[in-house]
Regions:
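Carboxylate/His-rich catalytic cores and anion/metal-binding grooves
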Residues: 1-3
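Aromatic-rich, solvent-exposed beta-strand/loop patch
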Residues: 6
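Active-site glycine/GP-rich loop and adjacent strand/helix microenvironment
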Residues: 9-195
Length: 195
């Protein structure tokens, strides 16, 4: 898809995209400069990138208008990241679980519990990988991708499916994501991040 078409689609959908792969201090300065003109109500993106942007804003004594929510994805959200994001953007932070192969596997509710998006995926524990005393590899079946379906795809993430209900009112199954795939981010001396 041509770049102009991507920009047009984003404009029509009122979406502004920051590039997480180019997120050094100079890029974040530009993000902070354009942020007020966006009228943003939510933010969605990599946990580490949003957390570093929040830290950037905070260390420069900047401020932004409160958001309705921040949705983190693609990486493990650590407690200290959740805290700085919530503090700077003055809103709840919701962690979402997905992968590049199958998006929208699960999302956190208002009670902080992870619900499987059962209208998009079937999520199973790999029973061949041992007993339930430890997290087991997850098998994901996409109900959304008709062109290239993933059926019982083992994505190397580990978790536990819970046999209980949540008092938030969402009846979708609960899960705990215990161990996700490992990836490292390296911060270069000039502030650029290598993923």
């Amino acid at each position: 898809m041509p770049r102009w078409e991507i920009r047009l689609r984003q404009e029509l959908r009122r979406v502004y995209q920051f590039d997480p792969f180019h997120s050094g201090a100079s890029e974040m300065a530009q993000w902070l400069k354009v942020w007020p003109s966006l009228g943003a109500t939510i933010a969605h993106g990599y946990a580490s990138t949003i957390a570093r942007f929040a830290e950037y804003i905070e260390t420069r004594k900047g401020s932004v208008a409160p958001l309705r929510g921040v949705f983190t994805t693609a990486e493990k959200l650590y407690p200290q990241q959740r805290e700085v994001i919530a503090r700077v953007f003055n809103c709840r932070v919701y962690d979402c679980y997905g992968s590049s192969e199958v998006q929208n596997i699960a999302a956190e509710c208002s009670r902080g519990r992870m619900h499987v998006n059962a209208d998009f995926v079937v999520l199973e524990e790999d029973r061949a990988a041992g007993d339930r005393s430890t997290p087991r590899p997850l098998l994901v079946t996409s109900l959304w991708n008709y062109a290239m379906p993933f059926i019982r795809y083992r994505n190397e993430d580990c978790g536990v499916l819970l046999d209980e209900n949540c008092d938030c009112g969402n009846n979708f199954p609960l899960m705990e994501l215990n161990i996700a795939r490992v990836s490292d981010n390296f911060v270069l001396p000039d502030g650029r991040v290598v993923r």
